[in-house]
Amino acid sequence: SVENGVLTIHEKVPLNFAVRGVGESYKKGEILLTKGTKLGFSELALLAELGFFHISVFVKPVVGVLSSGDELKDLGESLDNPAQIRSSNHIALANLAKSFGANALVFPLLKDKKSEVKPAIQNALESCDILITTGGVSMGDFDFLKAAVREYELIIDKLDIKPGRHIKVAKSGKKFILAFPGFPYSSMVAFHLSAREILGAWLCQKKDYIIKAFLKGSYAKKSPYLEFVACNVEFENGKVCVNLAGKKKGSSAIISNLNYKSALMIVPKERTNIAENELVDIMLLS
């Protein structure tokens, strides 16, 4: 209090009370942001405090999506016969690309016409850095994309995995071509195995998405391949657990298996069964 011009302190002041130490926020030579850091609200505030208003950043890569198949109809188009389906791959893949830091470009649906496949790929490559195609890579009579992709610098022609066995990866100069199967579940798994890794390296944001979890229940593997099985992730008594509740068995066309808090349980090629409560590797999707 102040009385007659005299300041009286009635309480003992703790040492360093209301004192900000020199260098408490950061010290000379300290690294505050590293290459590849994603700039959020805190990082931007830090740059503003330091007086940086022009900085060098990575240009977002453009991921193009080119879905193929005579059976496909786009959104808003009517299905003219029972053999036709609505295209969903381009929706899933474009949004996945955006969620992992890229800009997405969706090209018109490509028909199963051999003479149109290579020109469509070439045209798409002019507008994107990574081109993802879906369909046309399996063993069908009208699967023309596989031959077209093989004309480029082929890196991967096939993998012993399920789903996504017929995935192909090629390069055209500095650009990537990723040819995925037409089944939606397969294409979404293939994205996480390939496109996500490429984008992470491109943007210097590599991340390990594989963690350990305990399997609630058991699993019997029927294929001779390395499998990626849709599962639910939960926390139980401080442990990460997965289960297969509600996951439908069937073809690689089942989109809903990746809904909600899903992950991919990795079942090694040499395994046939996984016992209850066994510790397994799972791949997170985000």
Which stretches of residues belong to each language-model region?
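Short, glycine/charged-enriched hinge/interface segments at domain edges or termini
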Residues: 1-106, 248-249, 286
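Glycine-rich loops and low-complexity Gly/Arg-rich segments
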Residues: 7-8, 22, 34-35, 57-59, ...
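Generic structural signal for well-ordered, non-membrane alpha-helical segments
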Residues: 15, 22-25, 40, 86-90, ...
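Flexible glycine/proline-rich
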Residues: 26, 148-286
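Helix-rich terminal scaffold detector
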Residues: 56-180, 184-189, 201
